[in-house]
Amino acid sequence: MKEKELVVNTKTNGSKSEDVIISISLVKKLRDATGAAMTSCKQALQEAKGDIEEAIKVLRKTNLAQMSSKLQRKADEGIVALAVDNNKGAIIEIKFETDFVARNERLQKLAMEAAQLALVHDNLTDLKNAKLSSGETLESQISQDIAVIGENIQVSRIRQVKLVDNGIIASYIHNSVAPNLGQIAVLVALEGNVESDKLTKLGKNIAMHIAATNPRFLSSNEVPESVIMQEKEIFTAQARTTGKPEKVIEKMIEGRVSKFLEETVLLEQAFVIDGKTKISEVLSNAAKELGSEIKITGFSCLKAGEVVE
């Protein structure tokens, strides 16, 4: 079957014009190389008379002129990437406007290199100013990619998890599109005087649990009093609509606060693997089996594109 072709009229001499044939495969090739929209690729190839390299320059020139407006557009899609190096792990989120860009191989490589840089730079300002292997800063490279792709791209969040004593940094990627790259990224610092390979399976399972339950806090002690008070106010307002006696309402509020902690505190959550054993008990059972105290000292979970309050 003959490939479809686009016939483009391009002025060459005065009012004369000649037809430049641009194949669909050429448009797709430019799209794969840049991540730009099909329409933009077609227009760029039209202006460049079918020359791929010139078309990339056209895309950059056109999109640079529109850069200010692009940076104001919402970027709701994204990917998260993680990196682990001995006693430290890092996660970064890069947001785009469409999920197509998230599948762009060049942007995926950029995200993975940015995650490696995040092992050293623990805040967005330093990370954006850090230099990539190309010699460009991360911020500069992203500006260039915006110019080519034509979408707003943002490095939006960064997280680090560190070990203090012996242990491992366990990791998990959900909906992976490439190694250490996907839609949900989790890091867990698991400490104990145990051979690292014996902690690996436990750490992986806990990381998967975190991806499924997205806890907000590690322990009940870490929940701010302001959060508890806010939840109590909500529960109190709900309970009073029942018209029940004050003592009954107090018991209802206590029960709802306990349930809130069970849902949001990692150590209080029921392990997703069996649905009943608390994570704190999972650690205790593992400690008995391995002959050493095992504790979670930190964790982080980022979901690509989530709305952060």
UniProtKB/Swiss-Prot annotation:
The keyword Chloroplast does not apply. GO terms for molecular function: translation elongation factor activity. GO terms for cellular component: cytoplasm. It is found in: Cytoplasm. Keywords: Cytoplasm, Elongation factor, Protein biosynthesis. Residues 98-101 are annotated as: Involved in Mg(2+) ion dislocation from EF-Tu. It comes from the Bacteria. The keyword Protein biosynthesis applies. InterPro entries: EF-Ts_dimer_sf, Transl_elong_EFTs/EF1B, Transl_elong_EFTs/EF1B_dimer, UBA-like_sf. Disulfide bonds: none annotated. Its main location: cytoplasm. Belongs to the EF-Ts family. HAMAP family: EF_Ts. Associates with the EF-Tu.GDP complex and induces the exchange of GDP to GTP. It remains bound to the aminoacyl-tRNA.EF-Tu.GTP complex up to the GTP hydrolysis stage on the ribosome. This is Elongation factor Ts. It comes from Orientia tsutsugamushi (strain Boryong).
